[in-house]
Amino acid sequence: MPTTELISYDEAQNSAFDNVLHGKSKESRGGMRAMMNKDNKAHAAAVDEYFQFFDNKKAEDEVEAVRQERTDNYASLTRQYYNLATDLYEYGWSQSFHFCRFAYGESFDRAIARHEHYLAHNIGIKPGMKVLDVGCGVGGPAREIVKFTGAHVTGLNINEYQVGRAGIYAEKEGLSDKLKFVQGDFMKMPFPDNSFDAVYAIEATVHAPSLEGVYSEIRRVLKPGGIFGVYEWLMTDIYDNDDLEQRRIRLDIELGDGIAQMFKIDHGLSAIKAAGFELLHHEDLAATDDGTAPWYWPLDSDMRYAQNLSDLLTVFRMNKWGRLVMHNLIGVLEACSIAPKGTRKTADGLAKGADALVEGGKRKLFTPMYLMVGKKPEKI
């Protein structure tokens, strides 16, 4: 088990802060409209709390103590990141906060759903099973997997705002009887031992201070014989932390995506085994070079892969030109006190992260979809 000493936080105090920050915006349609309905002072405090971990911390000056500080404060870092980034994610990407592979001629929406189906298939989720979604976002993947499998899914999320939005979307789609969303920390899950038939995590456990720690908690709440599947964000074996440019890419990904620290593939494999899982399968789904669209194409201004108007709009919102328009628009809205102060700084941080993701993807330094499937032993 990891020896990292984690800093505790006051859940009641955080809940009160989040309610002031978001107000009724969790009940809005999301995206830009929700962004305009934040409390200005609380938003500024969230911006300061998040960016203190990255401001004036350059790749060439990075020392282990800086990364350790982020790791110790992972809960605060992650919660404030999603307090700031959720509305921008919904505006620019979708309600499924993850990447995916693309088949020939496949639209963005279909590819996102297929990526979720593929994980559910690998885990063997069936109708009536009790399933846990670790780090569920606003519930996009959970809703899709419920519709695909007929299982009951419980979503766990440290961010109260996202939990509230996930519940609203589930009710809107008539899925409240199949979905439940719980606010909590995946390093100390609020569930009894042996609670779930299957567990999955889609690009979420990267926020953990210790992969072994979060995988161990997943094993604890999984029933004996149950299957856990994860799409993990990992640096590849090519990544060299002593290479300053590669380190900058990694640090920009961490800044733009609310990550305390990234690990390499061998670390992820060691962690899932050390947590007590029998590793059934592992594969870097981003490594397949079959001539189809790369996973990062929506961030890379490459219109040739767009299949419909919705894809074109996604590309425009996420590419450099769209981000430049958003940068200037938010600046005007902040100056007019329509958008809360710090919104542009947040958007610029996400943009820096997006550029690093593309660069890391092209250079094969990083994967957002390292698939690991593990089984909890029948007898423990």
Swiss-Prot record:
The source organism is Gibberella zeae (strain ATCC MYA-4620 / CBS 123657 / FGSC 9075 / NRRL 31084 / PH-1)
This chain's protein is named Sterol 24-C-methyltransferase ERG6B
List, in alphabetical order, the Gene Ontology terms for molecular function in this entry: sterol 24-C-methyltransferase activity
Family of this protein:
Belongs to the class I-like SAM-binding methyltransferase superfamily. Erg6/SMT family.
What EC identifiers does the entry list? 2.1.1.-
What other comment is given for this protein?
A: In Fusarium, the biosynthesis pathway of the sterol precursors leading to the prevalent sterol ergosterol differs from yeast. The ringsystem of lanosterol in S.cerevisiae is firstly demethylised in three enzymatic steps leading to the intermediate zymosterol and secondly a methyl group is added to zymosterol by the sterol 24-C-methyltransferase to form fecosterol. In Fusarium, lanosterol is firstly transmethylated by the sterol 24-C-methyltransferase leading to the intermediate eburicol and secondly demethylated in three steps to form fecosterol.
Record's superkingdom?
Eukaryota
Keywords carried by this UniProt record: Lipid biosynthesis, Lipid metabolism, Methyltransferase, S-adenosyl-L-methionine, Steroid biosynthesis, Steroid metabolism, Sterol biosynthesis, Sterol metabolism, Transferase
Q: Which GO terms describe its biological process?
A: ergosterol biosynthetic process; methylation
Gene from which the chain derives: ERG6B
Give, as one word, the top-level EC class: transferase
Q: Which InterPro entries match?
A: Erg6_SMT_methyltransf (IPR050447), Methyltransf_11 (IPR013216), MeTrfase_SMT (IPR030384), SAM-dependent_MTases_sf (IPR029063), Sterol_MeTrfase_C (IPR013705)
Q: What induces it?
A: Expression is positively regulated by the FgSR transcription factor that targets gene promoters containing 2 conserved CGAA repeat sequences.
| Cellular component GO terms held in the UniProt record | endoplasmic reticulum
Provide the catalytic activity annotation.
lanosterol + S-adenosyl-L-methionine = eburicol + S-adenosyl-L-homocysteine + H(+)
The pathway noted for it is: Steroid metabolism; ergosterol biosynthesis
Report the function annotation for this chain.
Answer: Sterol 24-C-methyltransferase; part of the third module of ergosterol biosynthesis pathway that includes the late steps of the pathway. The third module or late pathway involves the ergosterol synthesis itself through consecutive reactions that mainly occur in the endoplasmic reticulum (ER) membrane. Firstly, the squalene synthase ERG9 catalyzes the condensation of 2 farnesyl pyrophosphate moieties to form squalene, which is the precursor of all steroids.
